[in-house]
């Protein structure tokens, strides 16, 4: 975990010994579970640090004031939500994962790492986005899922409070995708405030799309399960 500590420190992020130990245990549990549940194609220990942990922690440089409530959509193996929880133990984090086996891993790793104030919701994002307990309740919404930005914002912006931020880690060739999503972002109450480079040694250039919520999301969104992916707002 030396590289994790070194790069996080260079970004101005502080990790103590307990947090480093939590990341080490996270890596070990991820690799063990991945032998029976398809959680990630990345199994090399160093790549877990660079492509999962550091890529997740980079979000903390772009969320403005430290949030109190964060929701991670399509959390999978917990990225970026759980590394951000480890970084800021005071965060209240909700992880949304519709696949039962992945949600079971999330419940397991939350217990193993003794993380408090973490809720795992086994449901589709479209359903969660219409639930008054979650709708427009979060300071930060994250989504690292492999989907078009126009689809991701329909999952995420309904959950974001006005003034909050939606953070979408993406690959390098993102300009056209941002342009295609401009109508969806505006209709859902968002405004792009940055497309930031994410530079991690040994990893191809990635980007982080930063969207601020400037207006309420209309009641018609998100649409029914499956529709945002099949027919994005374009």
Swiss-Prot record:
Give the EC number: 2.1.1.-
Q: What does this protein do?
A: Specifically methylates the N7 position of a guanine in 16S rRNA.
Q: What is this protein called?
A: Ribosomal RNA small subunit methyltransferase G
What HAMAP family does the record tag this protein with? Answer: 16SrRNA_methyltr_G
The protein's matches in Pfam families, at most eight in alphabetical order, are given as: GidB
Q: Which family does it belong to?
A: Belongs to the methyltransferase superfamily. RNA methyltransferase RsmG family.
Any one of the GO CC terms? cytosol
Enzyme class, one word?
transferase
Q: What is its main location?
A: cytoplasm
- Annotated residues for binding of S-adenosyl-L-methionine: 74, 79, 125-126, 144
One GO molecular-function annotation for this sequence? rRNA (guanine-N7-)-methyltransferase activity
Question: What are the subcellular locations of this protein?
Answer: Cytoplasm
- What are the entry keywords? Cytoplasm, Methyltransferase, rRNA processing, S-adenosyl-L-methionine, Transferase
Alphabetized InterPro entries for the sequence: rRNA_ssu_MeTfrase_G, SAM-dependent_MTases_sf
**Keyword Protein transport assigned:** no
């Amino acid at each position: 975990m030396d590289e994790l500590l070194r790069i996080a420190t260079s970004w101005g992020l502080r990790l103590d010994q307990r947090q480093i130990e939590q990341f080490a245990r996270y890596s070990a549990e991820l690799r063990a579970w991945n032998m029976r549940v398809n959680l990630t194609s990345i199994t090399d220990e160093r790549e877990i640090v660079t492509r999962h942990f550091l890529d997740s922690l980079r979000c903390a440089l772009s969320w403005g004031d430290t949030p109190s409530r964060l929701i991670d959509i399509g959390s999978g193996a917990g990225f970026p939500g759980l590394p951000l929880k480890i970084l800021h133990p005071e965060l209240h984090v909700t992880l949304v994962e519709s696949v039962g086996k992945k949600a079971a891993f999330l419940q397991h790793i939350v217990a193993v790492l003794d993380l408090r104030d973490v809720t795992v919701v086994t449901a589709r994002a479209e359903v969660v986005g219409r639930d008054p307990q979650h709708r427009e309740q979060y300071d930060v919404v994250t989504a690292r899922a492999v989907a078009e930005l126009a689809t991701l914002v329909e999952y995420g912006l309904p959950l974001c409070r006005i003034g909050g931020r939606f953070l979408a880690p993406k690959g390098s060739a993102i300009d056209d995708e941002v342009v295609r999503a401009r109508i969806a972002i505006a209709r859902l109450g968002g405004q792009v405030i940055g497309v930031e480079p994410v530079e991690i040694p040994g990893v191809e250039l990635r980007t982080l799309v930063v969207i601020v919520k400037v207006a309420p999301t209309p009641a018609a969104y998100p649409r029914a399960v499956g529709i945002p992916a099949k027919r994005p707002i374009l």
